[in-house]
A protein has these predicted regions:
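Carbohydrate-active catalytic/glycan-binding domains of CAZyme proteins
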Residues: 20-201
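Bacterial Sec-dependent N-terminal signal peptides
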Residues: 1-22
């Protein structure tokens, strides 16, 4: 009886493996990296590196439609430089009180200027257009934003800062566009650890 159960369990896993192998072939969305995904009204929205301000939409995280342009960078610090829509990296997005908020990082090291910032834009529609309420520099020397909403409703942003390597910081937010208090360092590379074997990460 025990042998019979083991055979049945093995067959079940084998069937599942075959099913997934047939239905999902990676990559499911070629050419997209360092992406953020938001679920809204039963659909998934993704944006990130190489999407150039576009979102892709899916019902199942496997089959994705054609790109939809949702944001064009328009601010004083990037205008006139090489930091265009192709520099929209590492998206994060969420909906709060009917407003959609989109964050991304710019990591541009061009001959004309260096621009390493986190940018925020918002829209009333999940597919934009997203507009930057602050056209000035929003946050210097930080990348890869992630906003977390706690159970009490408090918002926090987590991000990477270039400080002797990539250090992880957190900061409380007044609202999706403003901070409250000072940033707090949460993680940094320790000497002689794996994070420092090549370059500090």
């Amino acid at each position: 009886m025990l042998v019979c159960k083991k055979i049945l369990i093995f067959c079940a896993f084998a069937c599942c493996g075959t099913l997934f192998a047939q239905n999902i072939q990676n990559p499911v969305l070629p050419g997209v990296a360092d992406a953020g995904v938001m679920k809204y009204n039963g659909k998934y929205y993704i944006g990130g590196v190489f999407t150039n301000g576009d979102f892709y939409v899916s019902d199942d995280l496997v089959h994705w439609g054609k790109p939809v342009h949702v944001v064009t960078m328009d601010n004083g610090w990037s205008r006139g430089s090489g930091a265009g829509n192709e520099q929209i990296h590492a998206n994060d997005m969420f909906c709060l009180n009917g407003d959609f908020h989109l964050y991304w990082s710019v990591n541009y090291w061009g001959k004309d200027k260096h621009a390493v910032h986190i940018v925020h834009a918002q829209s009333k529609n999940v597919l934009g257009p997203y507009i930057e309420p602050d056209k000035k520099t929003w946050m210097d020397n930080r990348i890869d934003p992630k906003v977390f909403k706690d159970d009490d409703g408090q918002l926090y942003m987590y991000m990477v800062r270039f400080t002797d390597g990539n250090t992880i910081w957190g900061r409380k937010m007044k609202n999706p566009a403003e901070f409250a208090g000072e940033p707090v360092c949460l993680f940094a590379s320790l000497p002689d650890t794996w994070e420092t074997m090549d370059n500090r990460v």
